[in-house]
Amino acid sequence: MAASVEQREDTIQVQGQALFFREARPGSGQAHFSVLLLHGIRFSSETWQNLGTLHQLAQAGYRAVAIDLPGLGRSKEAAAPAPIGELAPGSFLAAVVDALELGPPVVISPSLSGMYSLPFLTAPGSQLLGYVPVAPICTDKINAANYASVKTPALIVYGDQDPMGQTSFEHLKQLPNHRVLIMKGAGHPCYLDKPEEWHTGLLDFLQGLQ
């Protein structure tokens, strides 16, 4: 019998801005840990809802929370802490994690969201259980010493038809503790092109963190 899943939608206040989020969690028992899902510029938390990622994570025993980033989706009214393509302060995502009471989470970070996740990942004493970058932007804005200092396990994901995925990998491969999932025939939002492969690879990585 499939495990039951509880889902909800709400907003949180982060640094004076209202951010929308969707959450799925196991219907019974404790969640293993939290997974925070970010998104690219043409997407929102709805992407993870429609793809079934939130549901699959909750069924596997994780608390999955997808936010709409400032200025996008249903957080359109919120002011972003940095212009698009510039690194946001790591304190922004730290404040999101605090507001949602996630504990040390795994962060899934495609494309645009790299501007938020990379400063959080490389901040001294970063409370991050795992990192799943999917062809994120801003990888060239982090220096080698900062990459080398990251102890967080990472699963680097990209489609082999995505030049940006290859470019970001050239930087991300400096993370000392990483695995790579290259999706053949997939483009920039590779998780949309190959959802089954995405979910299998993601759940496998998360299981290794338990």
Curated annotation (Swiss-Prot):
Signal peptide: none annotated. The modification N-acetylalanine is found at residue 2. GO terms for cellular component: cytoplasm; nucleus. It comes from the Eukaryota. It is found in: Cytoplasm; Nucleus. It is an enzyme of class 2 (transferase). One of its GO terms (molecular function) is protein-lysine-acetyltransferase activity. Its EC number is 2.3.1.-. It catalyses: L-lysyl-[protein] + acetyl-CoA = N(6)-acetyl-L-lysyl-[protein] + CoA + H(+). The keyword Hydrolase does not apply. Belongs to the AB hydrolase superfamily. ABHD14 family. May interact with TAF1. Acts as an atypical protein-lysine deacetylase in vitro. Catalyzes the deacetylation of lysine residues using CoA as substrate, generating acetyl-CoA and the free amine of protein-lysine residues. Additional experiments are however required to confirm the protein-lysine deacetylase activity in vivo. Has hydrolase activity towards various surrogate p-nitrophenyl (pNp) substrates, such as pNp-butyrate, pNp-acetate and pNp-octanoate in vitro, with a strong preference for pNp-acetate. May activate transcription. This is Putative protein-lysine deacylase ABHD14B. It comes from Pongo abelii. The lineage of its organism: Eukaryota, Metazoa, Chordata, Craniata, Vertebrata.
